[in-house]
Structure formats: structure tokens, C-alpha cells
């Protein structure tokens, strides 16, 4: 009985080891928002404005919204496309070529 249990566990470990695949990850590219810092400060009219974040990036300031000036970090905005219906792909290509 013990030998059967050991054999079962050994075969399960063997199968598990050979069937697991190494997960391939895509490296995160260095984009314009990496290592970019932004700043929340007052403009000439006394309004809080965000500056120094490249276009396409979002400034995230850690702290209450009433704290001015404050520093933050720029993050790249995700771009997504809405799902297309099966026939939409052909129509979009025709519109782009016109």
C-alpha cells in the first residue's frame, strides 16, 4: 500500500514537472512616461494645475487634492479599441484607404 502511494506521488510529480510551461512575459518597453515626474501647482489665477507630464501620460499625485504644490508620477495611459462586429473589419479598411 505504501509503495503504491509513493509510486502515485512520484508519477504525479513527474507529470506535473514535464507538463508545466514557463510563462513567457513581454518586457515592459521604456516609454515616454517612465521616470517622468509631474507637479501640481497653482497657476496665475490660483487654480491647481498639473504640469510636466508628457502627452499620453497620466499624472498621479499621492496626497489630498487640497495639497498644493505636490509632486506625482506619470503613468502611460492604456489604449484600447472597442470590439468590432464580424463585418466591421472590411468597412474600416475601405474608409482608411479613402
Swiss-Prot record:
Highest taxon in the source lineage: Eukaryota
GO function term, MF aspect, one: toxin activity
UniProt keyword Signal, yes or no: yes
Subcellular location: Secreted
UniProt biased composition (Basic and acidic residues): 88-98
UniProt KW keywords: Complement system impairing toxin, Disulfide bond, Secreted, Signal, Toxin
Signal peptide from the UniProt entry: 1-20
Tissue specificity comment: Expressed in salivary glands.
Keyword Hydrolase (UniProt): no
Disulfide bridge positions per record: 33-57, 38-59, 53-74
UniProt cross-references to CDD domains, sorted A to Z: C5_RaCI-like (cd22951)
Functional summary from the UniProt entry: Complement inhibitor. Prevents complement-mediated C5 activation by binding to C5. Binds C5 at a different binding site than the other tick complement inhibitors OmCI and CirpT1, and the drug eculizumab. Inhibits the complement in human and guinea pig but not in other species tested (rabbit, rat, mouse, and pig).
Family the UniProt entry places it in: Belongs to the RaCI family.
Protein name: Complement inhibitor RaCI1
Species this protein is from: Rhipicephalus appendiculatus (Brown ear tick)
